[in-house]
Structure formats: C-alpha cells, structure tokens
Amino acid sequence: MRSLLAQGFMGSQRGRRKVALAMVATLGALLAGCGTALPTGDGRTPQHIDITLIGFNDLHGNLEPPHMAHRVQGPAGPVLAPAGGMAYFASAMAALKAQSPHHAVVSAGDMVGASPLVSSLFLDEPTIEAVNRMQIDFNAVGNHEFDRGWRELLRLQHGGCEKFTSREPCRISKPFEGAQFGLLAANTVREDGRTLLPATGIKRFTDGGVTVTMGFIG
C-alpha cells in the first residue's frame, strides 16, 4: 500500500494529532492486507489489493491561491512553487486518484476555521461544498473545527440553516446540505459519555473476490 501526502496544505504540522489519522489508517490497511495474505491451501499465490492512501491537513478554507510562492521539496532540493488554492488542490487530488482505482482520501483536521474571508464570511460553507466535490472519505476534526462551537460543527456535518453564530447561514446555498464525508472525533465526548461525532470510520475495497476493510480513527 502506498501512502501519499498532498503537500499543498501541509502547513506547519501543528502537533502529533494532525498525522494520527493517516498513521492509523496506514496501520489498519496493512493489518487488513495481512488478512488477505494467508496461504490458500492449494499452493496458489495469495491475492491482494493495492490501496493508495491520500492525506492532507490544515486546509483552513484557503479556496483562493495565495499571493506568494511556497517552498516545496523538488527532486533536486527545495524550490519555490506558485501553488495553492482549491482549483490546484483539486486537480492534484484527481491526478493522485487516477493513479489507483482503490484509494482513500482523508483529512487530519483544521479543514475549516481560521479561514480567509472568502470562506469565513459564509461560515465555511463554501469550503465544505468544495471538498464535497473532491469526494474525500473522512476528516478527523482539529481544534479549529470548533472555532464556532460544537453545534455549528454538527451543522457543517449534517447541513441545515439553523443559526448558531452571529452570522446568517445558508447565504450561498439554501438549504446547505452539509458535508458528504464523515467527520470523526474519537476524543470529544458529551456529558453522557457518547462521542460528539463518530469515533471511527470504515471503507471497504473489493477486487477479484478479495475484500480489504480499512479502519480510521478520528
């Protein structure tokens, strides 16, 4: 299994939790792969599935390209590249997906919050809708997903136009349909002990009679 990190929004890597989702997903896929590698009993080579794991974090609603170049690691060393913005990011994501029919796309948090005006003015609904079009699987919420409170975070997941902040929701799309990918939060619990959002997510891959189950912990 290959693990690929989209570099456009890796940012400052603010803590170990940012990479926890991708690391656990990688481990889960490897363990799942071990289940398919058992001997067949008749001497045949065991079948397997190649899975590409694509991860990113700290998008922070950066829908537009920045006004400066970013330092990225090129084949010959660091170079300055005029990259960024959702259009470039979505194109890079599509290219990675095209390389593997079996893939999972995960975000390790801070997809929204601390966002530029183009997203924050509309309660980050534009960012959720843009990421919906990219068809990712899960986002493990970070601290900035809670910038407007947990009720507003649930609205971003489930949709709707109920007002939880001083700004009016649904000013672009009415009704706002919410994220079409799962938000995960294993370490955020309600007073009754239930997690605010699902703690885990599962994606299954099937090819040639072989099924691999990949688990994600938010």
Please tell me what each predicted stretch does.
Residues 22-31:
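Bacterial N-terminal signal peptides
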Residues 4-23:
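Bacterial N-terminal signal peptides that target proteins for export
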Residues 34-218:
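Acidic, metal/ion-coordinating pockets
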